[in-house]
Regions:
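Sec/Tat signal peptide C-region and signal peptidase I cleavage site
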Residues: 18-25
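Extracytoplasmic small-molecule ligand-binding "clamshell" domains
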Residues: 25-102, 158-161, 248
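Periplasmic-binding protein-like
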Residues: 35-37, 113-119, 195-233, 252-255
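Bilobed "Venus flytrap"/periplasmic-binding protein-like clamshell domains
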Residues: 48-60, 120-156, 160, 164, ...
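Extended ligand-binding regions for polar small-molecule ligands
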Residues: 55-64, 125-143, 213-249, 253
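A local structural motif
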Residues: 63-72, 151-163, 176-177, 199-202
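Acidic, polar ligand-binding/catalytic clefts
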Residues: 71-134, 141, 145, 202-208
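Short helices/loops that flank or line small-molecule/ion binding pockets
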Residues: 77-91, 166-188, 193-194
Length: 255
């Protein structure tokens, strides 16, 4: 009889452990992210470690909800394929307008996290020359310069991809390209916050076409969690913690 009771106890403990493991496993989600170095304050990927303001905000949400987010970094084109193929649970950053033709048929839900602005960086001596001064336009590998696609189709602009933001800056500064279509805040952050340079070797030209929007987190697999993230970002009780994270990265939404 004692042996039977022990066996029953072990069975109950085993079931409880399995149930706890299953529950814990259900709370782990993969977020596909881009593998850019020097993309701060938004993100930075180096030595297989993904960091930055975007991750800190998402981890703050996850901790509050009892989730665990696992970040998997890929080049943008591969990230698109994995995300749209359902190989990762979420994508960050995402945006309803990005690769919209590839998203047809997918009911993707989005929650906005951080403002961004993409525009053209030029050498200070070329500031104000207008679109006519852009013949060779660089961009990060995997980017789509939506504001310039018509000019590219007309043959007025030739695109050059670079896997490195630092490589783009060098190409602009050396005159190998006329401008670089990139995230404006990222460029300012690198030169001012990391390099400590006030007289920037590459500058944003506001007279050229540019785009402003939000970096969203997107998913078609877990739309309920997207709703939770959206509510989290709007909840006044979370505002102080989120603003503190932004201050730690010197992230000014009006910059």
């Amino acid at each position: 009889m004692k042996t039977l009771r022990v066996a029953k106890t072990l069975l109950v403990l085993a079931f409880a452990s399995f149930s706890s493991f299953s529950f814990a496993a259900d709370q782990v989600y993969t977020i596909g992210v881009q593998d850019y170095e020097h993309y701060l304050p938004y993100s930075h990927y180096e030595n297989e470690v993904y960091s930055g303001l975007g991750r800190d905000i998402l981890d703050l949400f996850a901790k509050k909800k009892g989730y665990v987010f696992k970040y998997e970094a890929y080049p943008i084109k591969r990230l698109n394929w994995l995300y749209l193929g359902g190989k990762v649970d979420f994508r960050f950053p995402d945006n309803p307008y990005w690769v919209a033709n590839q998203k047809k048929g997918l009911d993707i839900k989005y929650a906005p996290l951080l403002k961004f602005a993409d525009g053209v960086l030029v050498s200070p001596k070329n500031l104000g020359k207008g679109v006519g001064g852009l013949k060779r336009l660089g961009m990060p590998l995997g980017y789509t310069p939506y504001a310039y696609l018509d000019l590219v189709k007309e043959g007025k602009i030739t695109l050059y991809e670079n896997p490195s933001y630092l490589g783009l800056y060098d190409q602009v500064w050396s005159g190998k390209i006329d401008g670089a279509y990139a995230n404006i805040r990222v460029a300012k952050y690198y030169w001012r916050k990391i390099k400590g340079v006030e007289a920037l070797p590459v500058v944003y030209d506001p007279g050229l076409p540019h785009v402003s929007d939000f970096h969203h987190i997107g998913s078609f697999k877990h739309k309920d969690i997207i709703d939770e993230i959206d509510a989290f970002m709007k909840d006044e009780s979370n505002k102080a913690a989120i603003e503190e994270l932004k201050r730690s990265y010197k992230f000014d939404p009006n910059d």
